Amino acid sequence: MSRFPSNFIPQKLKFDVIDSYIIKSIKVSLLQFNVPLCYYNQSTNHKKIKIVAKLVTNYQKDKHTICFNFQEDVDANKEKFMVFLQGGPGFPSVLPTSKNDPSFLEPLLKRDYAVLFLDQRGTGLSTPIDTKFLVNNFQNASQQFEYIKNFRADSIIFDCETIKNSLIPDQKWSVLGQSFGGFCSVTYLSFFPESLKQVLVTGGIPPLGMTADDVYKSTYKITREFNERYYKRYPLDVSRVNYIVSKIDQSDIVLPNGGKLTSERFQHLGLTFGGNGGIDKLHGLILKIYQDLKTTESISYGTLATIQDYLGFETNILYFLFQEAIYCGGKGSFSDWSAFRNKPDDFKITSSDSGQNKDSKFYFTGEMVYPSMINDYSELTQLKELAELIHNYKDWSTLYDLDKIKKNTFDIVPIVAATYYEDQYVTFENCEIVKRNYLKDSLRQYITNEYFHNGLRVGSEKVLNRLFELLESDNV
């Protein structure tokens, strides 16, 4: 597959306003666009999907109309548009309920930005993808795969460029990318640098020039550190966790939706380490499971429901299906269940984890996917063939033009990033390698250990203030 759709010219599309309302001092307008399913083969594939973008602007009763108005909501803000790209893959952007929800909205509105929250294709109010849709609309896994190949970062960016051309064709805009959204932002820089005024990234410097294997070797190392920190803070959880694992292995525990609670699925709960408060959150869940087992010899329905919905792999299946594919680009690149293949011995579940050695530490894993999930997660059981196709595919579209990225400088398209020293998902180690090899002339960083991966949410004002200081400073 070529890097760029042949003769790609962003269209100027009409759009529908599917909702518009005022919440105190903000106006929220939901804009719906019909875009090509496949940008690479539009001559033979005429299918369309819907993309919804949520436009948020400052509202003053004496100046603005209640409903969406193109002139006052788009034209008047055309020089200060900020597109927010959500993390994931496979998660929608938030639907704002106030200037403080999401927390990072207010700092942007204070700077007079119009903020466009994109529901990336396959998520939220855009044409969604879930197991039922894939099973009901396609005859086999090959057809499913041909469809979802169009839901990667490159297609997301073609959507962005199409929307920009439909709203502010003669202007540049800024982009704010959180986590996977940061990866998408750098893809945007690769394809359409002329469309970007500036790029802000939080916890999302992509591992340019690296393979999935490189990524997981790095993330296992920091996940090990998080496990040690967890057990140091809650030493009694060493025996509690081993007790829970032994009970899980001795039982057939069925979750409310029919999924299975196995020791492998239990191990996935370590994904929560990556956010501020994640260690404490996991401790609370471990304590509840342990108390359930000790007092009733079973895990309560409420606790099982919490475990079932803890990670989002079933409600957002692209998060499972594309977890490793986001690291694949170009001919010959494939993942082949990289996290599974690179799993260190001390993360592998053994008999000592099943209660036979109460002092051994059971290591939880991080943001990783494994073949066993297909059997343990109810919504994934019908996607086995599709998952295998994805993990063995070797002809992915290219997501980054490394030469173009290398040649970019801060004077052309400035990049500023909040880089978290203890980021479980996007490791500081890899970010520094990428900075040296590809972004040394274009990237300024706010490096901190005050926040984990969710710094944009928990420290919005400080994080964004620092990023704008980096953009505006002449002395860095």
Language-model region placement:
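An N-terminal hydrophobic leader/cap segment in hydrolases
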Residues: M1-V35
